[in-house]
Amino acid sequence: MVTIEAIIERAEDGTYCVYCKNDIFSGAGVSIDDAKADMKDQMEFYKKTAIEKGFKYPLFLDQEYQINYTIDAISLMKYYVKAGILSLSGIEKITGINQKQLWSYLNGTKPRKTQSDRIETGFKKLYEDLYYIFA
């Protein structure tokens, strides 16, 4: 089975885009699930068109494949805040970064690598806590 690496990002207009790290495929949508579905539709459309027109396409489209999705920390934070699942207060507690700074990241300020790592570490810790509670 072939594994495809894809990255999920949140655009400035609030939509999401998904793109393959090493391939030409991408998708967009108003939610993460919509963007994933759009990319899969694009992959199938590309294969179908390639067969009809007689040009080459990536061989993995004829095989079983899986897509591993990665989302950057800021896009993940935006997703949960916009969905009303987490608040800035809650994210402050899991990351140790004050709400005012988190708000600025949600609104366009790019965090330094250390701050981005702290956000990622906080979400991983939250994931682990939830995993062990429900495992």
Language-model-detected regions and their locations in the chain:
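DNA-contacting interfaces and partner/effector-binding or oligomerization modules
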Residues: 1-55
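Short, charged, surface-exposed hinge/linker loops at domain edges
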Residues: 2-3, 44-100, 104-105, 109-112
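A generic structural signal for ordered secondary structure
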Residues: 26, 42, 88-91, 123
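DNA-binding alpha-helical recognition surfaces that contact promoter or target DNA
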Residues: 37, 104, 121
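DNA major-groove recognition helix of helix-turn-helix/homeodomain DNA-binding modules
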Residues: 114-132
